[in-house]
Every structure is written in C-alpha cells, then in structure tokens.
Amino acid sequence: MNIPIELEVTVPGSPPKKACSISTWSDPVQAPLINTLRKQIVDVKCANGIQGYCNWGLVEIDIIIRITETSVKADIDNHVGGIFDAIQARPANKPNYNENVFEPTTHPDITVLLSDDMLVYDLHAIRTLAEKESYTVKISGEYNASL
C-alpha cells in the first residue's frame, strides 16, 4: 500500500552546499547544515505523524532559498544538490566525519525523506532576496512500506 507524503520545512540560515560532483557528505563543513535540515524534517514528520520516506513513484520538490545582499553566493544547483544529499542517507562509501554533530534521529545512515533522488521528476528551485537567510523545502511523494 502506498502512503502519500507531503511535507514542508523552513530552515533558518543557508542550505547545505554540494561542490561539483563531490557528495555533500564528503565535506565536514557541511555537517552542521545537513544536521539542521535533517532535524527540522524529523521534527515535522513526528509532529504530523508521518512515517517512512519517499521511496516509491514520482517525487515533486519545491525549494525556495532566501539570501541577503551580504550572503555568500553559490550556484543554485549547488544548494539543490546539497539539499538532495542531505535528505537521503549518506552513501555507504562516504567517511564517518563529525558523527558527534548528528543526533540519533538524524544520523547520516538514516534516510529521513528521500530514498534516492532519481525518484524526483519535478523540481522547482528559486533564490530570492530577503532580510534573513533561510530556505524552504516542500516535497510530495509516496511511501511504500512493503519495499
């Protein structure tokens, strides 16, 4: 049975950032940003009784990145890649860095929202100026408990 999942989180600060084809999980500097996003997701899932993660069908993701005039600039696709990496489990071949940054519910080996970003079929990402840095991730997909 497929269970629909819809979730939206808004996170203060800058999103995790991927550099070229290197996984966000390979950069220890990104660990606190990854953990912040993962914690927000886990909190929203718990508050709304959402179990599981998107692992079936087609997934839609909307991302809004709010930057200030003094924000450190990065290509929008680097942030999208960083967010995608962060909502999946860390690949098995990535090192265990900064394990103490993560809580048991946000541990890198846990899939918090997306089993594989190849399920994403529709992506909308925008960057806009704001008074404070933050970003919003909205995801719609399905969880198949039998997988």
Regions picked out by a protein language model, each given a short descriptive name:
Residues 1-147:
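Acidic, proline/glycine-enriched N-terminal capping motif
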